[in-house]
């Protein structure tokens, strides 16, 4: 187990560059026992403890001035159980590595988010999700968890455990790092399958008018709306018998790298320097991506490269409220004078039973707003958040928001159960930081 200062001048920064922390020490445990020892030693020294993955959260959920746990040595697959169709993986394993390993075994997760750079524990602990009629959240695919609690104990929990274990399982799948440090996750898997993706432009008004039909007819539907235009780019993913027809290398480079990252990055720079050009840039951007259809294994369809750095806010609203919420967002932008060069992303998720999941107990739709890194975003995000919260929106735990414990107590029926469990597992708040103090209370 190594102990070092964190980053340049002892400073850790997140991917978005908006969160920085200076931990007293950084620990890289090579085993669960070493991690438990690091937790016990931090408690003895009176220091707070947080684990950090790849830093893709825009909130300070992983920041600490105490002990920062780096899980990069806690990686790899522990076990594949083909009888029960599960895989148990070390918590620091990047999703990309997990997907590649599963594919080699002829297996796959059921759903994924937009990217796969995050660690499995970081992605699940913050509620990372994709889009889907019957599936979306990565955490909802969890069948079992192992975590180290504040006293250094190693606990396991699953949906088939004791009543106490089931209570922990319901909360810890999206535990925000508040209940302990996750060390291993058991996911449900299935035989690898093919998805056919159909991407095509569609007018904004038509998408909203046909939204219920588009959602019902597709296993995975999402779209991007370009502010200052009436245009969207839609994506429909559905299971396919094949044959496999991946995007060609040239087409992939043009669409996913040159247009979606290279040219898009330049357009963002121009828009940031000369905001008056943004409506024109938006019109051009909305027409740049052409319709295409391709068929491939799941992670190659669900995920795509994201190299343009940005800031993001995302809220889950009741699915039946999404079209009205989007109309209000568009009306706000039309009258506000704000200039937004980044598309708005819209996805869906079915209700689940995870205590602090943004889809807990209700079918949900996600609306994500973005601004390129370095561009003032507060005015846009504040106005958008006002609209989202008016529809009982639940913010993504790892994305920008201003909500606090009082708000969450009103929109999560199980909020009190979660905080009571936290009181039992971490009474001295070893895993506390400023973010958790705000969203969960002292």
Task: Tell me the role of every PLM-derived stretch.
Residues 1-442:
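Noncatalytic alpha-helical scaffold of FAD-dependent oxidoreductases
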């Amino acid at each position: 187990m190594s102990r070092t200062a964190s980053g340049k001048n002892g400073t850790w920064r997140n991917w978005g560059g908006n969160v920085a922390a200076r931990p007293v020490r950084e620990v890289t445990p090579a085993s669960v026992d070493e991690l438990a020892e690091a937790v016990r030693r931090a408690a003895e020294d009176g220091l707070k403890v947080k684990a950090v993955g790849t830093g893709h959260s825009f909130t300070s959920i992983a920041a600490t001035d105490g002990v920062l746990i780096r899980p990069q040595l806690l990686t790899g697959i522990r076990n594949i159980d083909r009888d029960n169709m599960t895989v148990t993986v070390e918590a620091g394993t990047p999703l990309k590595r997990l997907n590649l390993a599963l594919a080699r075994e002829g297996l796959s997760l059921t759903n994924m988010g937009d990217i796969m750079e995050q660690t499995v524990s970081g992605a699940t602990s913050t509620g990372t999700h994709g889009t889907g009629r019957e599936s979306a959240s990565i955490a909802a695919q969890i069948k079992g968890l192992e975590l180290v609690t504040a006293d250094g104990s190693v606990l396991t929990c699953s949906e088939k455990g004791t009543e106490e274990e089931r209570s922990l399982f319901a909360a810890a799948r999206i535990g925000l790092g508040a209940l302990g440090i996750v060390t291993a996750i058991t996911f449900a898997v299935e035989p690898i399958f093919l998805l056919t993706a159909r991407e095509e432009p569609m007018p904004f008004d038509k998408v909203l008018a046909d939204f219920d039909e588009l959602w019902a007819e597709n296993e995975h539907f999402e779209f991007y709306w370009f502010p200052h235009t009436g245009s969207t780019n839609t994506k429909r993913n559905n299971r396919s018998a094949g044959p496999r027809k991946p995007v060609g290398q040239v087409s992939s480079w043009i669409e996913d790298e040159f247009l979606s990252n290279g040219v898009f990055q330049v357009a963002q720079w121009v828009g940031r320097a000369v905001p008056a050009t943004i409506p024109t840039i938006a019109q051009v951007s909305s027409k740049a991506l052409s319709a295409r259809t391709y068929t491939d294994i799941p992670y190659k369809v669900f995920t795509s490269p994201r190299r343009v750095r940005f800031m993001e806010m995302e809220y889950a609203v009741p699915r039946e409220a999404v079209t009205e919420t989007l109309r209000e967002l568009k009306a706000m932008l039309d009258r506000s004078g704000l200039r937004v060069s980044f598309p708005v992303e819209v996805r869906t998720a079915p209700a689940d039973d995870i205590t602090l999941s943004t889809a807990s107990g209700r079918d949900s739709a996600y609306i994500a707003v973005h601004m390129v890194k370095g561009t003032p975003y507060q005015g846009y995000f504040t106005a958008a958040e006002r609209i989202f919260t008016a529809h009982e929106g639940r913010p993504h735990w790892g994305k920008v928001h201003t909500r606090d414990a009082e708000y969450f107590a009103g929109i999560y029926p199980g909020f009190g159960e979660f905080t009571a469990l936290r009181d039992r597992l971490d009474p001295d708040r070893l895993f506390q930081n400023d973010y958790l103090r705000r969203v969960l209370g002292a």
